[in-house]
Amino acid sequence: MKKAVITGATGSIGHALIDKLLREGVDVTVLYHKGSPRISTIPDGEHIKKIPCSLDEMKSLIPNENDYDVFYHLAWAGTTGATRDDADLQLKNIEYALDAVELAKKMGCRKFIGTGSQAEYGLSDKPLTPDTPTFPFTGYGMAKLAAGQLTKLKCRKLGIDFSWVRILSVYGKYDPEKSVIKSAIDKFTHNERAGFSKGEQLWDFLNAKDAANALYLIGCDSEHNESVYCLGSGKSAPLREYIETIHKLCKSRSEIDFGAVPYSKNQVMFLQADISALTNDTGFIPTIGFEDGIKELLD
């Protein structure tokens, strides 16, 4: 891989992926949402280009170059709150994903990598595999599932290799402020009382740098086409333990109130990835433990 395109690059995974690609000598082009306040966090440099192109503009974008290798489509509108069940918005996301495949073809890419979600599965009491039955209960999960299926067909038609990566819970420096880990760190570093659910749910957290390494390895792989992968650490622990670890590392005096926040409707109580297919195909193995990942965020 010599040249790559990324949409949705301003989140934790996107930032980590840019850093990984640049370290590996890959030239990176970022397509970013016009007016994004976070684009300033993307580094400038000889080997990185930034092109303003919102999701609804990909269809009309005429690229100046057509010698790219891999297209990473991370961007998605409506990932939190009520927007997850906004049917019209989620339908547009499917269209945008198909537009991204068309753009990948125009840019000369040999491979399209789309990012899905554990939300495609709904509820499961076993580790998630590419073959685990999918029963999404949110509009977001339904749209991700449909986007994965339809972009595969579009890639097949256009002669582009395809991979769909169902991402579980990834954390990093550029997480939303309301994410569990980011909000816990904020409360604990300010020694404020922090309320959470009971924390009984078994959860799989992966550091953004490990996620970026997985996406890089998938991009380099030319042997496996139309592959679906689950991306996580492959291990799970009670959410309560993760929160207590953060509290300890912050050396916080905060009172933790487990049970202050009720479980949501259809609360996922078990989340763990089976990464064996990903490891077998690409050699990916997570290397950053949860404690080390949190320490890095605190430094």
Predicted regions: what they are:
Residues 4-24:
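N-terminal Rossmann NAD(P)H-binding glycine-rich loop of SDR-like oxidoreductase domains
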Residues 123, 135-163, 189:
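Active-site Tyr-X1-5-Lys
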Residues 145, 158, 163, 170-182, ...:
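Glycine/proline-rich active-site loop of Rossmann-fold NAD(P)-dependent oxidoreductases
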Residues 173-178, 200-212, 228-248, 288, ...:
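Substrate-binding strand-loop-helix patch
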Residues 198, 228-229, 240-243, 251-270, ...:
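C-terminal "lid/loop" region of Rossmann-like NAD(P)-dependent oxidoreductases
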